Amino acid sequence: AKVDLVIEVRDARIPRSTGHPRLQRWISGKQHLLVLNRRDMVPPAAQQAWSAWFRAQGQVVWWCDAKAGTGVKQLQQAAIRAGADLNARRAGRGMKPRPVRALMLGFPNVGKSALINRLVRQKVVESARRAGVTRSLRWVRLGQELDLLDAPGVLPPRLDDQQAALRLALCDDIGQAAYDNEGAALAFAQLLRLLEGVADSGVAAGLLEARYRIPLGELAAGGPDVEGWLAAAAERHTGGDSLRMATKLLDDFRCSRLGAIALELPPGRPMPSVAVEFEQEDC
């Protein structure tokens, strides 16, 4: 069935890396709502910076936390309003009104399914199944004007940008086949040290030492000694198992135990980069 409205979901911690460069071309001519999910994991200053940047591009952003339900009602109302606008245009062309069909799109693991579940829980009435190409697709009526497809569309992440690939890995937004936890954790520790000097990132000075009671030293050649830090942290916390410590560090970030951290800020704001290499996946 033809889709009229696309609800694009991105990860609020990495809004650029979870935006697909070809999406605007794919959805040309359709209404578009941009959602930044996991707002609770990003500092308010970073949210304000991103909102201002998107506003300057003529794009309204809907900040949500699908897990807690924050911002979901406002998103639902915005989608229903978009449906009403589209039907007003149809009426102006002498066409009969019909429920507008909306599809939710986004990279893997950015929270599309959780968001759909939140929206569906607030549904007004459930509509009938309509045959899809390969399986039955269920449409859920969210208002008099709007039907939402209850299966999310998945955009393929592109790993040709190594810094974006690292951020996707850190946020658990790409498959683990593309990276190893130890390498990702070492890059993350290095990135955290660099982010200490970036306003609005949410990274406090000495974050790793404060959290794990292990100081992050400097290499003689310059730069943080992340391998030495990981080995010492493993001795203290995981019985000397570096891989388990690496996994713990990544999990602590992904579960917000390190606090709210923005890994990306709007274009024009200098952000640090670290040397990484990821496998390229076909898109």
Language model feature labels by segment:
Residues 1-6, 13-33, 39, 45, ...:
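Helix-rich effector regions associated with P-loop NTPase G domains
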Residues 27-28, 55, 120:
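Short conserved AdoMet
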Residues 70-72, 107, 112, 133, ...:
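Gly/Ser/Thr-rich helix-start
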Residues 86-90, 117, 123-129, 198-200:
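Short, structured loop/turn "capping" segments at alpha-beta junctions
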Residues 95-97, 118-119, 140-141:
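Solvent-exposed alpha-helices and their adjacent loops that cap or buttress functional pockets
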